[in-house]
Amino acid sequence: MSDKFQDRTMAFAGICQAAYLVQKVARDGSCDEAALRESLSSILVTNPSQPLEVFNNTHLAIRDGYRALVEQLGADGSQKNAELTRYVVSLIALERKLAKRKDILNMLGERISQIGRQQQHFDLLDEQILANMASIYSDLISPIGPRIQVAGTPLFLQQPLVQHKVRALLLAGIRACVLWRQLGGSRTQIIFARKKMVELAKRY
């Protein structure tokens, strides 16, 4: 199994983790803090020396994503989650549109750099940082369309902090999609190499 295939599977697990956490936060109002931190940290890694660096140089950072990948692409149909699949497919479609917009990509880089500087003074999960990440998604990415409709518990979805986390996680999902595309990821790979992807994901 090639290193490039492993890297692509890792990037796809990153997309799955962001989608899984979006669903978790939207439904329950919260999610595992360590997984949230790992996914959001990836947004700030804009010039990695190797693909794994995007996920803090450890596959453990996206363990929830690997598990979601196995459930979504594995043979056991009872484990599949249609809503999570919709989020993953929507993120991939949105990133494909983003890739064609150099103007937005430049602004995206500038805004992410600003958050990198702010992080010297605030924790990554501070509400101000979350709000700034959320606004990047709302201002630059969501308007490209198609808009991703997030379902969940109305009581939680009305809360500003939950809204910030959901949008910040969608931004993390876009980051993972960028990496996946850069590594040669494609929809045909998901269809024809799903068994290999599941076998690899089960190792983590």
From Swiss-Prot:
Protein name: High frequency lysogenization protein HflD homolog
Family the UniProt entry places it in: Belongs to the HflD family.
Compartment(s): Cytoplasm; Cell inner membrane
Pfam family name, one: DUF489
Disulfide bonds: none
Keywords: Cell inner membrane, Cell membrane, Cytoplasm, Membrane
NCBIfam families the record matches: PRK00218.1-2 (NF001246), PRK00218.1-4 (NF001248)
Annotated signal sequence range: none
Coiled-coil region list: none
Gene3D superfamilies: HflD-like
GO cellular component, one term: plasma membrane
InterPro entries: HflD, HflD-like_sf
The keyword Transmembrane helix belongs to this UniProt entry's keyword annotation: no
Topology with respect to the bilayer: Peripheral membrane protein
